[in-house]
Protein backbone atom coordinates (compact mmCIF):
# COMPACT_ATOMS: atom_id res chain seq x y z
CA UNK A 1 0.00 0.00 0.00
CA UNK A 2 1.24 3.50 -0.85
CA UNK A 3 2.28 5.92 1.89
CA UNK A 4 3.12 9.60 2.07
CA UNK A 5 6.41 10.74 3.55
CA UNK A 6 6.12 14.37 4.66
CA UNK A 7 9.01 16.50 5.91
CA UNK A 8 8.15 19.56 8.01
CA UNK A 9 7.68 22.19 9.05
CA UNK A 10 6.84 24.28 5.99
CA UNK A 11 4.82 27.44 5.45
CA UNK A 12 2.37 26.76 2.63
CA UNK A 13 1.85 29.58 0.15
CA UNK A 14 0.92 30.00 -3.48
CA UNK A 15 -1.98 29.13 -5.78
CA UNK A 16 -4.05 25.99 -6.14
CA UNK A 17 -6.68 25.10 -8.76
CA UNK A 18 -9.67 23.37 -7.20
CA UNK A 19 -11.02 20.22 -8.87
CA UNK A 20 -14.65 19.35 -9.55
CA UNK A 21 -16.66 18.15 -6.55
CA UNK A 22 -16.54 14.41 -5.98
CA UNK A 23 -19.84 14.54 -4.08
CA UNK A 24 -21.56 16.12 -7.09
CA UNK A 25 -19.71 14.20 -9.82
CA UNK A 26 -20.72 10.78 -8.45
CA UNK A 27 -24.51 11.34 -8.28
CA UNK A 28 -24.37 13.12 -11.67
CA UNK A 29 -22.55 10.16 -13.28
CA UNK A 30 -25.23 7.77 -12.01
CA UNK A 31 -28.05 10.17 -12.92
CA UNK A 32 -26.81 9.95 -16.53
CA UNK A 33 -28.42 6.48 -16.57
CA UNK A 34 -31.78 8.28 -16.79
CA UNK A 35 -30.92 9.85 -20.17
CA UNK A 36 -31.81 8.15 -23.46
CA UNK A 37 -29.28 10.28 -25.36
CA UNK A 38 -25.55 11.00 -24.88
CA UNK A 39 -24.48 13.46 -22.18
CA UNK A 40 -21.20 15.30 -21.61
CA UNK A 41 -20.05 16.05 -18.05
CA UNK A 42 -17.20 18.55 -17.59
CA UNK A 43 -14.89 19.26 -14.64
CA UNK A 44 -15.11 15.67 -13.33
CA UNK A 45 -12.24 15.03 -10.88
CA UNK A 46 -9.78 12.19 -11.55
CA UNK A 47 -10.42 10.01 -8.52
CA UNK A 48 -10.64 6.33 -7.64
CA UNK A 49 -14.39 6.56 -6.88
CA UNK A 50 -15.00 8.26 -10.25
CA UNK A 51 -13.09 5.49 -12.07
CA UNK A 52 -15.11 2.86 -10.20
CA UNK A 53 -18.39 4.61 -11.11
CA UNK A 54 -17.42 4.80 -14.79
CA UNK A 55 -16.48 1.10 -14.75
CA UNK A 56 -19.84 0.28 -13.18
CA UNK A 57 -21.74 2.28 -15.83
CA UNK A 58 -19.79 0.41 -18.54
CA UNK A 59 -20.73 -2.94 -16.97
CA UNK A 60 -24.39 -1.92 -17.12
CA UNK A 61 -24.01 -1.43 -20.89
CA UNK A 62 -23.44 2.33 -21.09
CA UNK A 63 -20.75 3.71 -23.40
CA UNK A 64 -18.34 5.72 -21.24
CA UNK A 65 -15.38 7.73 -22.51
CA UNK A 66 -13.10 10.23 -20.89
CA UNK A 67 -11.13 12.82 -22.89
CA UNK A 68 -11.06 15.86 -20.66
CA UNK A 69 -14.84 15.60 -20.21
CA UNK A 70 -16.69 12.39 -19.42
CA UNK A 71 -19.08 11.28 -22.19
CA UNK A 72 -21.85 8.83 -21.27
CA UNK A 73 -24.29 7.20 -23.67
CA UNK A 74 -26.77 5.12 -21.66
CA UNK A 75 -29.08 4.40 -24.62
CA UNK A 76 -27.93 0.75 -24.79
CA UNK A 77 -27.99 -0.13 -21.08
CA UNK A 78 -29.05 -3.79 -20.88
CA UNK A 79 -27.69 -5.01 -17.53
CA UNK A 80 -29.57 -3.96 -14.40
CA UNK A 81 -27.33 -5.31 -11.64
CA UNK A 82 -24.41 -3.54 -9.91
CA UNK A 83 -22.18 -6.43 -8.75
CA UNK A 84 -20.45 -6.79 -5.39
CA UNK A 85 -16.87 -6.66 -6.72
CA UNK A 86 -17.35 -3.02 -7.82
CA UNK A 87 -19.81 -1.88 -5.17
CA UNK A 88 -17.81 -3.14 -2.18
CA UNK A 89 -15.28 -0.31 -2.45
CA UNK A 90 -17.76 2.54 -2.85
CA UNK A 91 -21.00 3.53 -1.16
CA UNK A 92 -22.06 5.80 -4.03
CA UNK A 93 -23.04 2.79 -6.15
CA UNK A 94 -26.43 2.74 -4.38
CA UNK A 95 -27.21 5.74 -6.63
CA UNK A 96 -27.51 3.37 -9.61
CA UNK A 97 -30.69 1.89 -8.10
CA UNK A 98 -33.10 4.84 -8.50
CA UNK A 99 -32.25 5.56 -12.17
CA UNK A 100 -32.39 1.84 -13.10
CA UNK A 101 -35.82 1.21 -11.58
CA UNK A 102 -37.19 4.55 -12.85
CA UNK A 103 -36.12 4.03 -16.47
CA UNK A 104 -36.08 0.24 -16.87
CA UNK A 105 -38.51 -0.94 -14.18
CA UNK A 106 -35.83 -2.99 -12.42
CA UNK A 107 -32.47 -2.67 -10.75
CA UNK A 108 -30.32 -4.38 -8.17
CA UNK A 109 -27.30 -3.14 -6.28
CA UNK A 110 -25.09 -5.06 -3.88
CA UNK A 111 -25.11 -3.53 -0.39
CA UNK A 112 -22.34 -0.91 -0.44
CA UNK A 113 -18.87 -0.36 1.08
CA UNK A 114 -16.78 2.86 1.34
CA UNK A 115 -15.54 4.80 4.39
CA UNK A 116 -16.25 3.14 7.72
CA UNK A 117 -17.68 6.14 9.58
CA UNK A 118 -20.75 5.35 11.59
CA UNK A 119 -24.07 3.89 10.54
CA UNK A 120 -24.88 5.01 7.01
CA UNK A 121 -27.75 2.67 6.25
CA UNK A 122 -29.53 2.52 2.90
CA UNK A 123 -32.98 2.31 4.53
CA UNK A 124 -33.92 5.90 3.59
CA UNK A 125 -33.16 5.15 -0.07
CA UNK A 126 -35.34 2.05 0.14
CA UNK A 127 -38.36 3.63 1.86
CA UNK A 128 -38.20 6.54 -0.61
CA UNK A 129 -38.32 4.23 -3.63
CA UNK A 130 -41.12 2.21 -2.00
CA UNK A 131 -43.16 5.39 -1.59
CA UNK A 132 -42.73 5.99 -5.33
CA UNK A 133 -44.27 2.56 -5.95
CA UNK A 134 -41.23 0.30 -6.26
CA UNK A 135 -41.18 -3.16 -4.73
CA UNK A 136 -37.96 -3.73 -2.80
CA UNK A 137 -36.46 -7.03 -1.68
CA UNK A 138 -33.21 -7.64 0.18
CA UNK A 139 -31.84 -10.96 -1.07
CA UNK A 140 -28.35 -12.50 -1.05
CA UNK A 141 -26.73 -9.19 -0.10
CA UNK A 142 -28.49 -7.29 -2.89
CA UNK A 143 -31.11 -4.55 -2.80
CA UNK A 144 -33.53 -5.51 -5.59
CA UNK A 145 -36.05 -2.94 -6.86
CA UNK A 146 -38.81 -3.42 -9.42
CA UNK A 147 -41.98 -1.71 -10.62
CA UNK A 148 -44.78 -2.53 -13.05
CA UNK A 149 -45.01 0.34 -15.54
CA UNK A 150 -43.79 3.71 -14.24
CA UNK A 151 -43.05 4.89 -10.73
CA UNK A 152 -45.78 7.16 -9.30
CA UNK A 153 -45.21 10.63 -7.84
CA UNK A 154 -45.63 10.88 -4.06
CA UNK A 155 -45.45 13.30 -1.14
CA UNK A 156 -42.41 12.09 0.80
CA UNK A 157 -41.44 13.40 4.24
CA UNK A 158 -37.91 12.24 5.03
CA UNK A 159 -37.32 10.91 8.56
CA UNK A 160 -33.98 12.65 8.71
CA UNK A 161 -31.91 14.83 6.42
CA UNK A 162 -29.94 12.56 4.08
CA UNK A 163 -27.94 13.73 1.07
CA UNK A 164 -27.74 10.22 -0.37
CA UNK A 165 -31.45 9.44 -0.09
CA UNK A 166 -32.46 12.89 -1.38
CA UNK A 167 -30.42 12.15 -4.53
CA UNK A 168 -31.98 8.70 -4.97
CA UNK A 169 -35.57 9.93 -4.61
CA UNK A 170 -35.04 13.04 -6.76
CA UNK A 171 -33.44 11.05 -9.60
CA UNK A 172 -36.11 8.35 -9.56
CA UNK A 173 -38.93 10.92 -9.42
CA UNK A 174 -37.77 12.66 -12.63
CA UNK A 175 -39.28 9.82 -14.69
CA UNK A 176 -42.22 9.03 -12.38
CA UNK A 177 -45.83 9.67 -13.36
CA UNK A 178 -47.12 12.82 -11.63
CA UNK A 179 -45.58 15.14 -9.06
CA UNK A 180 -43.23 14.24 -6.22
CA UNK A 181 -42.60 16.52 -3.24
CA UNK A 182 -39.63 15.77 -0.96
CA UNK A 183 -39.98 17.41 2.47
CA UNK A 184 -36.99 17.68 4.83
CA UNK A 185 -34.76 17.32 1.77
CA UNK A 186 -31.00 17.85 2.03
CA UNK A 187 -29.91 21.33 0.93
CA UNK A 188 -26.26 20.68 0.06
CA UNK A 189 -24.76 22.42 -3.00
CA UNK A 190 -24.12 18.96 -4.51
CA UNK A 191 -27.89 18.26 -4.42
CA UNK A 192 -28.47 21.54 -6.25
CA UNK A 193 -25.81 20.58 -8.80
CA UNK A 194 -27.37 17.15 -9.42
CA UNK A 195 -30.81 18.75 -9.84
CA UNK A 196 -29.44 21.35 -12.25
CA UNK A 197 -27.81 18.59 -14.30
CA UNK A 198 -31.15 16.77 -14.55
CA UNK A 199 -32.90 20.01 -15.54
CA UNK A 200 -30.33 20.42 -18.34
CA UNK A 201 -31.51 17.02 -19.66
CA UNK A 202 -35.19 18.04 -19.52
CA UNK A 203 -36.27 17.22 -15.96
CA UNK A 204 -38.73 19.52 -14.17
CA UNK A 205 -37.36 20.24 -10.69
CA UNK A 206 -37.95 23.22 -8.39
CA UNK A 207 -36.86 24.07 -4.85
CA UNK A 208 -33.40 22.47 -4.95
CA UNK A 209 -31.30 24.09 -2.23
CA UNK A 210 -34.33 24.35 0.08
CA UNK A 211 -35.80 21.63 2.31
CA UNK A 212 -38.75 21.16 -0.08
CA UNK A 213 -37.98 19.88 -3.57
CA UNK A 214 -40.76 19.46 -6.15
CA UNK A 215 -40.29 17.18 -9.15
CA UNK A 216 -42.79 16.91 -11.99
CA UNK A 217 -42.22 13.62 -13.74
CA UNK A 218 -41.43 13.64 -17.47
CA UNK A 219 -41.58 10.80 -20.03
CA UNK A 220 -37.89 10.86 -20.95
CA UNK A 221 -34.62 12.74 -20.51
CA UNK A 222 -32.45 13.74 -23.47
CA UNK A 223 -28.91 14.95 -24.07
CA UNK A 224 -26.98 17.83 -22.51
CA UNK A 225 -23.63 19.28 -21.49
CA UNK A 226 -23.01 20.11 -17.84
CA UNK A 227 -20.09 21.35 -15.72
CA UNK A 228 -19.68 19.95 -12.19
CA UNK A 229 -19.34 22.59 -9.46
CA UNK A 230 -15.98 23.08 -7.67
CA UNK A 231 -15.21 20.90 -4.64
CA UNK A 232 -15.97 22.96 -1.52
CA UNK A 233 -14.33 20.41 0.78
CA UNK A 234 -11.08 20.38 -1.22
CA UNK A 235 -11.21 24.19 -1.18
CA UNK A 236 -11.72 24.23 2.59
CA UNK A 237 -8.91 21.71 3.10
CA UNK A 238 -6.38 23.90 1.26
CA UNK A 239 -7.57 27.03 3.08
CA UNK A 240 -6.95 25.24 6.40
CA UNK A 241 -3.52 24.09 5.13
CA UNK A 242 -2.51 27.71 4.64
CA UNK A 243 -4.07 28.80 7.95
CA UNK A 244 -2.29 26.22 10.14
CA UNK A 245 1.08 26.86 8.45
CA UNK A 246 0.69 30.65 8.91
CA UNK A 247 0.86 31.03 5.13
CA UNK A 248 -1.20 32.51 2.33
CA UNK A 249 -3.09 30.92 -0.56
CA UNK A 250 -5.22 31.71 -3.58
CA UNK A 251 -7.79 29.03 -4.52
CA UNK A 252 -8.84 29.30 -8.17
CA UNK A 253 -11.93 27.64 -9.72
CA UNK A 254 -13.63 27.85 -6.30
CA UNK A 255 -17.24 28.68 -5.45
CA UNK A 256 -17.21 30.90 -2.33
CA UNK A 257 -20.98 30.86 -1.74
CA UNK A 258 -20.84 27.11 -0.95
CA UNK A 259 -18.42 27.73 1.94
CA UNK A 260 -20.04 30.44 4.08
CA UNK A 261 -19.84 28.52 7.39
CA UNK A 262 -16.22 27.48 6.82
CA UNK A 263 -15.05 30.97 5.80
CA UNK A 264 -16.75 32.46 8.89
CA UNK A 265 -14.81 30.09 11.18
CA UNK A 266 -11.52 30.82 9.37
CA UNK A 267 -12.12 34.54 9.89
CA UNK A 268 -12.79 33.82 13.59
CA UNK A 269 -9.43 32.02 13.65
CA UNK A 270 -7.75 35.23 12.51
CA UNK A 271 -7.45 34.64 8.77
CA UNK A 272 -7.66 37.56 6.36
CA UNK A 273 -10.03 36.31 3.63
CA UNK A 274 -11.13 37.83 0.34
CA UNK A 275 -13.47 36.32 -2.24
CA UNK A 276 -14.27 36.90 -5.90
CA UNK A 277 -16.72 35.18 -8.22
CA UNK A 278 -14.55 32.07 -8.64
CA UNK A 279 -11.64 32.54 -6.22
CA UNK A 280 -10.88 32.74 -2.49
CA UNK A 281 -7.69 34.10 -0.94
CA UNK A 282 -6.50 33.58 2.64
CA UNK A 283 -3.57 35.27 4.35
CA UNK A 284 -2.46 34.62 7.95
CA UNK A 285 0.22 37.37 7.81
CA UNK A 286 2.54 34.93 9.60
CA UNK A 287 0.25 34.67 12.65
CA UNK A 288 -0.75 31.54 14.55
CA UNK A 289 -4.49 30.78 14.25
CA UNK A 290 -6.83 31.27 17.23
CA UNK A 291 -8.93 28.34 18.49
CA UNK A 292 -12.57 28.22 17.33
CA UNK A 293 -15.67 26.31 18.44
CA UNK A 294 -17.32 24.25 15.71
CA UNK A 295 -20.54 22.23 15.58
CA UNK A 296 -21.20 20.14 12.48
CA UNK A 297 -24.71 19.91 11.03
CA UNK A 298 -26.34 19.54 7.60
CA UNK A 299 -25.88 22.37 5.08
CA UNK A 300 -25.91 25.37 5.31
CA UNK A 301 -24.30 24.79 8.74
CA UNK A 302 -20.68 23.69 9.22
CA UNK A 303 -19.92 20.57 7.10
CA UNK A 304 -18.92 17.31 8.79
CA UNK A 305 -16.40 16.78 5.98
CA UNK A 306 -14.39 19.77 7.31
CA UNK A 307 -14.44 18.59 10.93
CA UNK A 308 -11.09 16.73 10.93
CA UNK A 309 -9.29 19.67 9.32
CA UNK A 310 -10.62 22.10 11.95
CA UNK A 311 -9.76 19.65 14.74
CA UNK A 312 -6.16 19.91 13.50
CA UNK A 313 -6.40 23.71 13.29
CA UNK A 314 -7.51 23.88 16.92
CA UNK A 315 -4.71 21.54 18.02
CA UNK A 316 -2.06 24.03 16.83
CA UNK A 317 -4.05 27.20 17.61
CA UNK A 318 -3.82 29.67 20.49
CA UNK A 319 -6.28 28.63 23.20
CA UNK A 320 -8.78 25.80 23.61
CA UNK A 321 -11.45 24.92 21.05
CA UNK A 322 -14.44 22.56 21.12
CA UNK A 323 -15.46 20.51 18.07
CA UNK A 324 -18.88 18.82 18.25
CA UNK A 325 -19.84 16.22 15.63
CA UNK A 326 -23.62 15.78 15.18
CA UNK A 327 -23.78 14.15 11.73
CA UNK A 328 -21.83 10.87 12.03
CA UNK A 329 -20.87 8.88 15.09
CA UNK A 330 -17.36 7.43 15.30
CA UNK A 331 -15.80 10.31 13.35
CA UNK A 332 -12.88 11.20 15.64
CA UNK A 333 -10.56 8.40 14.51
CA UNK A 334 -7.93 10.99 13.50
CA UNK A 335 -7.63 12.29 17.08
CA UNK A 336 -5.58 9.37 18.52
CA UNK A 337 -3.33 9.56 15.45
CA UNK A 338 -2.77 13.31 15.94
CA UNK A 339 -2.04 12.59 19.63
CA UNK A 340 0.90 10.44 18.43
CA UNK A 341 2.28 13.69 16.97
CA UNK A 342 2.04 15.40 20.38
CA UNK A 343 -1.45 16.92 20.08
CA UNK A 344 -3.40 17.45 23.31
CA UNK A 345 -7.07 16.49 23.00
CA UNK A 346 -9.82 14.74 24.96
CA UNK A 347 -12.89 13.13 23.46
CA UNK A 348 -16.07 13.44 25.51
CA UNK A 349 -19.06 11.80 23.82
CA UNK A 350 -19.47 13.59 20.46
CA UNK A 351 -17.15 16.49 21.31
CA UNK A 352 -13.37 16.75 21.10
CA UNK A 353 -11.71 19.33 23.35
CA UNK A 354 -8.57 20.65 21.67
CA UNK A 355 -5.78 22.31 23.67
CA UNK A 356 -3.63 24.20 21.20
CA UNK A 357 0.15 23.65 21.24
CA UNK A 358 2.84 25.55 19.34
CA UNK A 359 4.20 22.66 17.22
CA UNK A 360 3.52 19.01 16.43
CA UNK A 361 6.25 16.36 16.00
CA UNK A 362 6.55 14.01 13.03
CA UNK A 363 5.37 10.43 13.60
CA UNK A 364 4.10 7.34 11.80
CA UNK A 365 0.31 7.64 11.55
CA UNK A 366 -2.49 5.77 9.82
CA UNK A 367 -5.32 7.14 7.70
CA UNK A 368 -8.75 5.83 8.74
CA UNK A 369 -11.16 7.64 6.42
CA UNK A 370 -11.01 10.20 3.64
CA UNK A 371 -11.10 13.52 5.53
CA UNK A 372 -9.19 12.23 8.56
CA UNK A 373 -6.36 11.19 6.26
CA UNK A 374 -6.17 14.66 4.70
CA UNK A 375 -5.80 16.19 8.17
CA UNK A 376 -2.89 13.82 8.92
CA UNK A 377 -1.10 14.87 5.73
CA UNK A 378 -1.59 18.55 6.62
CA UNK A 379 -0.31 17.83 10.14
CA UNK A 380 2.83 16.34 8.58
CA UNK A 381 3.39 19.54 6.59
CA UNK A 382 3.61 21.65 9.77
CA UNK A 383 5.18 19.12 12.18
CA UNK A 384 8.87 19.11 13.13
CA UNK A 385 10.60 16.18 11.40
CA UNK A 386 9.30 13.32 9.26
CA UNK A 387 5.71 12.05 9.20
CA UNK A 388 4.72 8.83 7.43
CA UNK A 389 1.00 8.58 6.58
CA UNK A 390 -0.10 5.00 5.96
CA UNK A 391 -3.19 3.69 4.07
CA UNK A 392 -3.46 6.72 1.81
CA UNK A 393 -5.82 4.92 -0.58
CA UNK A 394 -8.49 6.75 1.44
CA UNK A 395 -7.10 10.09 0.24
CA UNK A 396 -7.02 8.98 -3.41
CA UNK A 397 -10.75 8.34 -3.18
CA UNK A 398 -11.47 12.02 -2.56
CA UNK A 399 -8.54 14.29 -3.44
CA UNK A 400 -7.12 14.66 -6.93
CA UNK A 401 -3.28 14.66 -6.83
CA UNK A 402 -3.13 16.12 -3.32
CA UNK A 403 0.66 15.68 -3.12
CA UNK A 404 1.24 17.62 -6.38
CA UNK A 405 -0.97 20.47 -5.21
CA UNK A 406 0.70 20.61 -1.78
CA UNK A 407 4.16 20.48 -3.38
CA UNK A 408 3.26 23.51 -5.51
CA UNK A 409 2.55 25.34 -2.22
CA UNK A 410 5.98 24.44 -0.85
CA UNK A 411 5.29 21.17 0.99
CA UNK A 412 8.02 18.55 1.13
CA UNK A 413 5.91 15.46 0.40
CA UNK A 414 6.49 12.29 -1.59
CA UNK A 415 4.46 9.21 -2.35
CA UNK A 416 6.23 6.01 -1.38
CA UNK A 417 5.00 3.08 -3.47
CA UNK A 418 3.88 0.11 -1.41
CA UNK A 419 4.72 -3.53 -1.98
Swiss-Prot record:
Annotated positions binding phosphoenolpyruvate: 22-23
The protein, known as: UDP-N-acetylglucosamine 1-carboxyvinyltransferase
One of the GO BP terms on file: cell division
Pathway where this protein functions: Cell wall biogenesis; peptidoglycan biosynthesis
Localization of this protein: Cytoplasm
Organism: Salmonella gallinarum (strain 287/91 / NCTC 13346)
InterPro entries documented for this protein: Enolpyruvate_Tfrase_dom (IPR001986), Enolpyruvate_Tfrase_sf (IPR036968), MurA_subfamily (IPR050068), RNA3'P_cycl/enolpyr_Trfase_a/b (IPR013792), UDP_GlcNAc_COvinyl_MurA (IPR005750)
Annotated Gene Ontology cellular component terms: cytoplasm
Residue numbers of 2-(S-cysteinyl)pyruvic acid O-phosphothioketal PTMs: 115
Binding positions (UDP-N-acetyl-alpha-D-glucosamine): 91, 120-124, 160-163, 305, 327
Family assignment from sequence similarity: Belongs to the EPSP synthase family. MurA subfamily.
Keyword Cell inner membrane found: no
Reactions mediated catalytically: phosphoenolpyruvate + UDP-N-acetyl-alpha-D-glucosamine = UDP-N-acetyl-3-O-(1-carboxyvinyl)-alpha-D-glucosamine + phosphate
Amino acid sequence: MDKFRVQGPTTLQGEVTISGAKNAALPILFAALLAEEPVEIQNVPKLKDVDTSMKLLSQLGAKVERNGSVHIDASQVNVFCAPYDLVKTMRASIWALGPLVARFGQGQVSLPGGCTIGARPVDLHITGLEQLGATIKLEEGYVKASVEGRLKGAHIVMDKVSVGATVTIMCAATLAEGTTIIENAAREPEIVDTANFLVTLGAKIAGQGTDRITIEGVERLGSGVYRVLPDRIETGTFLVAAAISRGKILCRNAQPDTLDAVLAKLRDAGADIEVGEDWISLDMHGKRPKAVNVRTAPHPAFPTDMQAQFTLLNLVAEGTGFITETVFENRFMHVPELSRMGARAEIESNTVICHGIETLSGAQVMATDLRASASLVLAGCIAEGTTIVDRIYHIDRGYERIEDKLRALGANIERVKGE
